[in-house]
């Protein structure tokens, strides 16, 4: 048995020539806080914090769009949606789930993201 403690980080990829654009999108549009990235890696990238989880951006040529995605719980879903849409990010909804509200968006590099807020009794 594997005794998991928590998720440590999420890693997404962007085309190499758009890495700086990714840094700007995730700091200026999404509002993530950059954190230290060790200099031991051979490939460029950036690290950010989302709560107590790391969010890492690396490079990969020839990306394809899929249904893979990362999901993040937020405190105020509608405020998050308004923040993104006010900065030109298109949001969309998919199937409704019984215990949570959610929406999706694509970053400028085709990475699919879900933001969600659980319904409280």
Protein language model annotation of sequence segments:
Residues 40-44, 64-66, 97-101:
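Short acidic/glycine-enriched loop/turn segments that link adjacent beta-strands
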